[in-house]
Amino acid sequence: MPMSKSFLKKALLGGAVAAGAAVWAIAPRSFSDKRRNYVPAVPDVWYAHRGLHDAGSGLTAQYANESGEYVALARRMAMKAGYGSPDTPGVIAPENSLAAFAAACEAGYGIELDLQMTRDGEVVVVHDGDLMRVAGDPRRIADLTYDELTRIPLFPTDAPGACKAAPLPLALEEPPLVTTPDNAPEGYYQHVPLFADVLKVVAGRVPLIVEYKFDDNSKWDPRDVELMEKGDALLQAYSGKYVIESFNPAAVNWYKENRPEVCRGQLSWWPSGKGKTADPVALGKEYAAGALVFDWISRPDFVAYDWHGGNSPQVRLARFMGAVPVSWTVRSRDEYAQCSDQFDRHIFEAFVPDEQ
């Protein structure tokens, strides 16, 4: 049966409305708003993911062909900056450590890093909600004071190039029985640093991408606001170049409402593989976030997206409307070749980019 003109008209109208709604939802900050607030662009450099590190994220067997050169560079640059020595037997510059950030500065790379808050309200730089992967300690950052963190070495018994720390004694008990030592361990080690100390080390030498981390990106509570306020206060007193980003649209919106002059970015990815949640409600929210339909909340200046999704309709549309696409996390020359024309900036680890 042929379609009636009335049905076709309604279908076309519905499609136009849906397309218009998608464009409205995904649209970044307007050019006039950028001009009015003198918003800087995302500096055009390579960004070292969690610093230039010799242990931690991305250093898996999958990338072993190129990661050796990367680890060697991280150690060389860290030692040049005064961290460790050729005689240091273990890890010198673990991810998100002062040594890793100093190494990135020495190599001339920008830095991507992560902010969380300790039990006593200190803003620290660490990615995961707990210390298991980076210190073999299952305790959560939110349950530890900064003083305790200074006595917990990152990758304490691991060799350079390790992607995960070996579990501490009693870490795998149920419940875990790990406790913080009364005194700092002897010898060289790195621990979770204060954000204030990271800013002192970087001292404006390279630009920063600062990510605000939260346990649940679909919620917003007073402790989350406290992290925003304290992190921003440190950045307001900092004279170097930086931009901010978060998976949580409410965090990016906080900057929209309170610091419109700061370049802000929405982090996202298309849920897939092992990282995909089994909760159908949460998964629906993740798919919506991956489609960038919450960008109307934050109106970002850039979209930091999993590099696999650079050719997706939502990223291409955001780029067309003026958002700067930033890839994460590129871990080989082959991955860079696959996504280089889809993104304008790149966050990398586990290989040394040819373009420096």
What do the predicted segments below correspond to?
Residues 2-356:
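Phosphate-group recognition and catalysis centered on beta-loop-alpha active-site segments
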